[in-house]
Swiss-Prot record:
One CC-aspect GO term: exodeoxyribonuclease VII complex
InterPro entries: Exonuc_VII_L, Exonuc_VII_lsu_C, OB-fold_nuc-bd_dom
Subunit composition and interactions: Heterooligomer composed of large and small subunits.
Protein name: Exodeoxyribonuclease 7 large subunit
Length: 445
């Protein structure tokens, strides 16, 4: 019979104490073993057993963690698992709850990866300052990948759809296995040295850490860092990271995304070109309008200063001067005609014959012959002086200098202006030595 002082526990209490002891005594543990009895119910959780030749332990990996597995758990697969020891109290089952699991062999690779990444990072190979920017317009692209993988199909499909004018050279290479890293490195160095390419793309599809190990090679990482040509790395899926991703100038999460990063969409380019053309047309029309306005202003200035315009101006001035000259000549002729008429009147008043008759009468009245002779001589001198004065103002003297007096035969009126005559009219022109009949052919004022 039990001692009354001993504590009596229920199964629940005992299992709870055992669970606390296990969880408190063991931190995270790594276990390498073989999978057995793998089940995945509708809940999405993963249940299986880890075993070796002599023992086994039940394991659970709940859905949030199991969905990130990079492989499909299957019977007999050797894995490396990390988790915490616990006790399932309802059944008293001792088990390991895992938060990470990878295929066996990846553990050593992961440690090697972490060590190499830390060393290259310390050397500055991952620094953003040394990375090159991608060119704005990629014209030639080198793609280093497997010629038969899904990655190359994805890349070429996206490139053909978005920008079919791109010149693409496929440099076929192994992307998995012992010789893959050396082959990729050699192709990269040759493509870079050729100077033919604007960008070099290194890519492959997803896989385990061991499958992707060629892209964690130190020689490849240093070749990417030393390349003069910008390098894009697109290895595996979005959750996969390799050293080539860290050291490359640009890391793309997938091969398809890498292709989209490298080339623009041709539809977007067409739209941009159309917008640029519309803008250019608008600017051309604006510039043409301004140029036409300037040309019109210059044409007006040129017309105002052209020889033809100046000749027209001079012609108008000549016509004006001609009209003024004709008007002044008519004024002069009118004044001369008035003076002629006045002279004729004076001539009639001082007709020598009349004066001579008067003088003769006076002479007859004078009886001294000598006095009469002197008087006659004096009167003759006066007569000559008057005759010279009359001759100076006589129209006949003007006519003698080359002018003509034009009159109408019908009434003897003097023609003073070209506007007074009509074509075909007959006129009389008085010259120095006679008169002539003339006929008007044309008139100009």
């Amino acid at each position: 019979m039990a001692d009354r002082n001993d504590q009596i526990l229920t199964p629940s209490q005992l299992n709870s104490l055992a669970r606390d002891l296990l969880e408190g005594s063991f931190p995270l543990v790594w276990v390498e073993a073989e999978l057995s009895s793998v089940t995945r119910p509708a809940s999405g959780h993963l249940y299986f057993t880890l075993k070796d030749a002599r023992a086994q332990i039940r394991c659970a990996m709940f859905k949030p963690k199991s969905t990130w597995l990079k492989f499909q758990p299957r019977e007999g697969l050797r894995v490396l698992a990390r988790g915490r020891l616990t006790l399932y109290e309802a059944r008293g089952d001792y088990q390991l709850v895992l938060d990470h699991m990878e295929e066996a062999g990846e553990g050593a690779l992961r440690r090697a990866f972490d060590e190499l990444r830390a060393r290259l990072a310390a050397e500055g190979l991952f620094d953003a300052e040394r990375k090159q920017a991608l060119p704005a317009h990629v014209q030639r692209l080198a793609v280093i990948t497997s010629p038969s993988g899904a990655a190359v199909r994805d890349v070429l499909s996206v490139l053909a759809r978005r920008f079919p004018l791109l010149e693409v050279d496929l440099l076929p290479s192994l992307v998995q296995g012992d010789s893959a890293a050396a082959q990729i490195t050699s192709l990269l160095q040759r493509a870079d040295a050729s100077g033919r390419y604007d960008v070099i793309l290194i890519t492959r599809g997803g896989g385990s850490l061991e499958d992707l190990w060629a892209f964690n090679d130190e020689r490849l990482a240093r070749a990417i860092a030393a390349a003069q040509t910008p390098v894009v790395s697109a290895v595996g899926h979005e959750t996969d990271f390799s050293l080539s991703d860290f050291v490359a100038d640009v890391r793309a999460p997938t091969p398809s995304v890498a292709a989209e990063l490298l080339v623009p969409d041709q539809r977007e380019l067409v739209a941009r070109v159309r917008r640029a053309q519309a803008r250019m047309t608008q600017l051309q029309q604006h510039a043409l309008g301004n140029a036409m306005q300037r040309a019109d202003r210059l044409a007006l200035r040129l017309r105002a200063q052209s020889p033809q315009a100046r000749l027209q101006l001079l012609h108008r001035r000549q016509q004006d001067a001609g009209r003024q000259l004709r008007a002044r000549m008519m004024q002069v002729l009118e004044r001369l005609q008035a003076r002629v008429q006045q002279g004729q009147a004076q001539l009639q008043a001082h007709n020598p014959q009349r004066q001579l008759a008067g003088l003769q009468q006076r002479l007859r009245a004078l009886h001294p012959q000598a006095a009469m002779q002197r008087r006659l001589q004096h009167d003759q001198l006066q007569l000559r002086s008057i005759a010279r004065s009359l001759e100076a103002v006589s129209p006949l003297a003007t006519v003698a200098r080359g002018y003509a007096i034009v009159t109408r035969p019908a009434d003897g009126s003097v023609v003073r202006s070209a506007a007074e005559v009509v074509t075909g009219e007959r006129l009389r022109a008085q010259l120095a030595d006679g008169s002539i009949q003339v006929r008007v052919e044309s008139g100009e004022s």
